[in-house]
Amino acid sequence: MEEIMIQSIDESIHCGLIKNALFLSERLYASTANEDNLFKIAQIYYQMGKINQCLLILQQHPQITMIKNLYLLALSNYDLGNIQEAESSIIKCCIYFEKYFQPNNNNNNNNNNNNNNNNNNNNNNNNNKDKCNNSNKNNDSNNNSNSNNNENEYYGIYSDILCEFDDIVDINSISYGFDSPCSIGSVYYLMGLISKRKNQKEKAIKYLKKSVYTYPFLWVAFEQLCNICPDEIDISDLFSHTNLIHQINHLNQQQHQQHQQFQQYLSNSLNQNKVNNNNNNNNNNNNNINNNNSSNKNNEQTITSTVATGTTNITTNTIKPNNFIKPPYHPNHRVGLTPSSFYDSSIHITPINFKASIQQTNQQQQQQQQQQPQQPSQQNLQKYNNRYFVTPQTPLSHITPILSNRFSQNVVDPIPMVMDTPDSKGSQHPPSSNSQTPYTPSTPGVHHHQKQQPHQHKKSAPPSQMIKKSMSNEFDTPMSLDLKSPIFTTSTSSDVHGFTSSTSKQQQQQQQTKQQTTTTTTTTTSITDKEVLLTKTKKQVNFGKTEEFSLKSLSSSLSDDDYDEENHHYQQHHHLHHHNKSIDELELEEDDQLNITDNSVQPNFYEFDESSILDFNGGDLYEGLIELHKGQTQLLELFFILADSYRLLCLYLCKEAIESFKRLSEEQYRTGWVLTKVAKAYHELIDYKEARSIFQEVSQMEPYRLEGMELYSTLLWQMNEDAELSYIAHKYSEFDRLSPYSWVVVGNCFSLQRDHEAAIKLFRRAIQLDPDMTYAYTLCGHEYLANDELELALNAFRMAIRCDPRHYNAFYGIGLIYYRQEKYNLAEYHFRKALSINESSSVLCCYLGMTLQHNPNKIQDGIDMLYRSIEIQPKNTFAKFKLAAFLFANQQYHHAIDQLLEFKEIEPKETPIYILLGKCYKQLGELDKALDSLNTALDLDPKNSNYIRSLIDKLPLEDEDDNQDYFQLN
């Protein structure tokens, strides 16, 4: 029931039925109240946007230990502004991953540490309390390097958290469902956001870098990193393919070692068991021959005794390696491929279990039998070696199967892969007591009867059908069937994987003619226990959960004491159950279970192409890994270009950023996100026409994109495009009223109409929707500045800096306030601070030069800064005019006239140009040119006619105050 409910919850979420998923998750938690099911309820509430409900659900739990619940608790607190509570939860996750997900750098050290851990377990358990009470002491006497000492000091601060982890028996179980690279990276990312909010810059940089190192595709973490320190980022280090593989292997190194150790352990077990079977082969043959004339009851006892003998050989004669570590066990762990957790989420190892592949494999087998009739089928055995570590990932393998009426009404026992039934006509070739039977590897679930010759099935199952039978058994076993025998009990290398190797008809006929004996009877435990365990396991769909091995259950099953008794009862029942059925019934059951009969109703499985099936030991897996490697390389190359371009834009190297974005392919470049960043770069370069055309293209290409439109509205405000600004304000306000970008656009529209009060209300509405929207605070500050509310403007700009320390517009706004208040030293400081962030800003250089002019000791520095502003942006008319005014004040009239004439070519209708030109010509004695310039100014600006006429009247006279009013000419 629990498996069905979990699958139903996942399907409901996938179909957008959130309320139905919430109802099912509540039923699931009522049935089984654990942290895993609690996470499902809280996660659904969080996805619905009900953060308060999510927080209360998690807080009501008496004790939260699982990492995914701690992460969701911290995320909810962060969204609600509870920064301290969020940090207390997320720090546990960070310490856990930093402490327990760091494999040693040396394999030799790993082996030595494993041996030392086995010898020091008792001492560590006895010293847990001492470690908690004495947190300042070094717990590891072997740490002699400075890095290890610093690590001990770091963990000593959080000794209480480490003590909580020490009390947990299975430390790896608390990260179940949340141990993928993306999950670990998201934990570090949230810790970086919290540190940034607390103004802990170094700590924020540390965790944001760890986030990108752990999972390079976590783009939001890289964006935050660029907002803090773009000059400290090494793109080649963060988005290197070698670094990605290193990080993935770094996270999974311990799991790989356990995997290899367990493979070696099973290999040693199989090799020694094979030797024992060879030594006892003659005795077994004699016992089997003597038992051929016995009754069915004696026959069953012989089979049972053989099973018990095989089990004893395995459990008593196998040798464990010294460095074998029993891996951590979690009841919900599933079997999966483990080259790395990243590959687990990308590759699905699928067995051949479809009709097309069965027919093709059958034809190939018949051809091989005709070409090599005498060769034993050892290749088929070798082909499927080491396949027991692969979970069948069929399209519907995670869905509880729908059984037929026969299976749903009766107690179902799994049908063996190859079942020999007694011949109704009796034995035609009685066995000879003097004949010797060659050794044959045993197969699971196969009973060769000693009383008579094995019956030849009408349809010989090829290896593909055997695989399909085993896989169908693995997923068709009812959940109510609860067998507790071990999962794997092996006697040879052929039966450990759960696959059967049958002898062809030609080989059996040759053996009947020459030797007239039956094959050796060696049986193993049924694979039913493995099927039941895999059926009962859960499949969690969480934040990037990867599938892992249930190695503890595999290793511990080899030494269970109650194995013999349970296997004895099961083999008895299993043997008698199939002896009571005819051959036709067994074939019908096999066809019904395989669903390959022509007239049967086919289940709604997805069609799989056989070319997509990956062989674990063949070339297909190698080719698949190569394709995966190519895909990762291509994705990292794309991320490298995007990251490099975005970093350049954050450094306000706009020309370089535009060229870097052009390295993208046409498909990637013609996207809304990229074009928005390119338009922003042109806007910073004061190329308003190009930026406007790009924004218009984005608005038509992706009308749903609102991010970046706030900058588009500011551009229209600067260009005084009232009609277009009103149009997009109406458009986006109707499209999404819950978006802060929509309200910023509307606010700019009212600001252009000089309705500053309405604009302030709209900007504050945007801040309510997104308290971290830096640009809304900045625009709100400018509106307060327009209303001469300087204190409110200062508060708004400071809030913007708090959200983004590199937002130079906020520093520029504070500098304007201090400049208006004639606090030139403070104004200079903030202008320089803004200029240190954006060194290519012509406006900042201009205002800094204006500020320096008021310092008598820095007048020349001010002039140089204005020249720099014009050099950065030659069309910056405001800088040209201010430079001309400075030159006029310093009696450099010819240079001032040159700047004014350049300004006149760009903006020929600006009145201040002609007024200042008239003053310059007057000082040079060229009164005719001065009169012409002043008359032109009078024609362009009749409103200031009184001031201009007074200048005309004073042309023949010397005016001592002419040098004092040039700043009024704006």
UniProtKB/Swiss-Prot annotation:
Feature: compositional bias, Low complexity: 359-379, 500-525
Q: Where are the TPR repeats?
A: 35-68, 74-107, 142-175, 185-218, 319-353, 361-394, 546-580, 636-671, 672-705, 740-773, 775-807, 808-841, 843-876, 878-910, 911-944
Q: What UniProt keywords are attached to this protein's entry?
A: Cell cycle, Cell division, Mitosis, Nucleus, Repeat, TPR repeat, Ubl conjugation pathway
* Basic residues bias: start-end ranges: 446-460, 570-580
Q: Which species does the entry assign this protein to?
A: Dictyostelium discoideum
Q: Which parts of the chain span the membrane according to its record?
A: none
Spell out the family assignment given in the record's similarity comment.
Belongs to the APC3/CDC27 family.
Tell me where in or outside the cell this protein is found: Nucleus
Q: Which GO terms describe its biological process?
A: anaphase-promoting complex-dependent catabolic process; cell division; metaphase/anaphase transition of mitotic cell cycle; protein ubiquitination
Region Disordered, residue ranges: 106-149, 274-300, 358-379, 414-525, 556-582
Q: What is this protein called?
A: Anaphase-promoting complex subunit 3
Keyword Membrane in the entry? The reply is no
What the entry lists under InterPro entries is as follows:
TPR-like_helical_dom_sf, TPR_rpt
Q: GO CC: one term? A: cytoplasm
Per its database record, what is this protein's job? Component of the anaphase promoting complex/cyclosome (APC/C), a cell cycle-regulated E3 ubiquitin-protein ligase complex that controls progression through mitosis and the G1 phase of the cell cycle.
Which portions of the chain have biased composition (kind: Polar residues)? Answer: 424-443
The annotated subunit structure for this chain is:
The APC/C is composed of at least 13 subunits that stay tightly associated throughout the cell cycle: anapc1, anapc2, anapc3, anapc4, anapc5, anapc6, anapc7, anapc8, anapc10, anapc11, cdc20, cdc26 and cdh1.
Functional pathway: Protein modification; protein ubiquitination
Which superkingdom? Answer: Eukaryota
